[in-house]
């Protein structure tokens, strides 16, 4: 999208409320990694399989370390919510504490077939931002609300890391961000 339609997306890219958190967990000089993801779901939209955490296919760029009283993360997501998510609506869900695990998540849990009591749906209001590490096992529950789910995902990493290999071709609307 060209100007002025892209301006709100630019404004929240390094929103002053999230920058201190990203500086703390990623370090000064963090950078955007991946192109943004704009998610919309209508009522009865299907969910998305859980991913992240340890186990087969583990990516060392998706790490979580706590050492000497400080948290350090690799690839980190800021999920801006543009619509309310109430209990039972579906949407973003996580397995709390899984970012600290050293063992693979059971396949039945990743498919939401078993152990559902360990899954937490994230509730929030429009305008909220949810920050989490890609090391956390997360996914999407089917959308049950009458209103549309709207969420924007920005992914960041430490300035010296690159999760996406090589360079992506960015949309022209991002040209003025450099």
Where are these regions (language model features)?
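Non-heme Fe(II)-dependent double-stranded beta-helix
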Residues: 1-67
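Residues that flank catalytic or metal-binding motifs in active/ligand-binding sites
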Residues: 5, 33-34, 46, 74, ...
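A structural signal for short, well-ordered beta-strand segments
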Residues: 35-37, 78-80, 152-156
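Short edge-strand/loop segments of extracellular domains
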Residues: 40-42, 95-101, 149, 155-161
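Histidine-centered catalytic micro-motifs
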Residues: 48-55, 95, 137-140, 154
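Short, surface-exposed loop/helix-turn segments at secondary-structure junctions
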Residues: 51-63, 107-118, 148, 167-173
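Double-stranded beta-helix
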Residues: 71-141, 161
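Non-heme Fe(II)/2-oxoglutarate
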Residues: 109, 129, 136-178
């Amino acid at each position: 999208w060209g100007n002025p339609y892209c301006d709100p997306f630019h404004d929240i890219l390094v929103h002053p409320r999230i920058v201190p958190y990203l500086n703390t967990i990623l370090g000064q000089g963090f950078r955007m990694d991946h192109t943004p993801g704009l998610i919309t779901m209508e009522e009865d939209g299907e969910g998305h399989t859980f991913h992240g955490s340890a186990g087969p296919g583990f990516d060392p760029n998706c790490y979580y370390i706590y050492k000497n009283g400080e948290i350090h993360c690799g690839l980190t997501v800021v999920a801006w919510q543009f619509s309310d998510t109430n209990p039972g609506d579906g949407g973003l869900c996580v397995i709390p504490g899984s970012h600290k695990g050293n063992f693979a998540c059971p396949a039945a849990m990743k498919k939401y077939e078993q152990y559902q009591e360990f899954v937490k749906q994230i509730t929030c209001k429009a305008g909220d931002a949810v920050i989490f590490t890609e090391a956390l096992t997360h996914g999407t529950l089917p959308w049950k609300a009458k209103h549309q789910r709207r969420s924007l995902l920005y992914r960041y990493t430490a300035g010296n890391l690159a999760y996406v290999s090589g360079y992506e071709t960015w949309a022209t609307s991002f040209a003025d961000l450099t």
